């Protein structure tokens, strides 16, 4: 059953970081029956993020045959098309990075994109930005973080994949360098691995024996995405798409509960988005934060919610502090616009 056309709230904050390396994209009306949304979380500069904003949407649409494959129930074709789009854009990005100044050449980025229709949502992602649906107040994660550390099923599988391809995991990072196991760009872990190993040898970071055991034919770091399609249904209340700056501070279930309380209180999805960002900062958030929320209008406003007590302890804590920090959120947002 179809859901109502969503209202969107979105906010990007630099937070305490010296640079803003996050960005997001929202394209409405450019694909029949679907809206495109994306969050890009860059590292070692913003150049890869800027490239993805220019190239990834159009490449995905072309691979999806103008959006026709989004209407199909053939998950194999859908996954193949989006995987092709991601990999092709990454190949072009690597060639482009080779031509850039040294300060921009080493950049990379995660990418989490979703195609939101009336009856289903399709998500493709590399990295650790996350998509979460609220279904009747229950959090359903549509993505699994591509990180090479931790005990989750995905983390263990990603670590094994990197090692099987000839790379290694050190201090929870791919080759001791990158905290995500899938990403766009990062030429030192792709097309310039030989040069990276030679440089490390000069700096005594590893031995010649260690270098000789590295397999340079496999993909240590890949831009091939995981692709998920989910039916929305009448229990779908809203969808949160956000960078790890949110999820490292607030659990998925608490983010869903927080947004529901906000919508019950005032019904404004933009205010809810801003308050959620403030809540992440209140939880000692140390990263850039980008949040986009699609609200299907299912959470009814409740008068007199200030006296509402049926909230978890974690959500109560962020509710108390987020209001105080909203002025800081606005100030940070304005500062990022000026920059």
What are these regions (language model features)?
Residues 1-339:
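PP2C/PPM-type serine/threonine phosphatase catalytic domain
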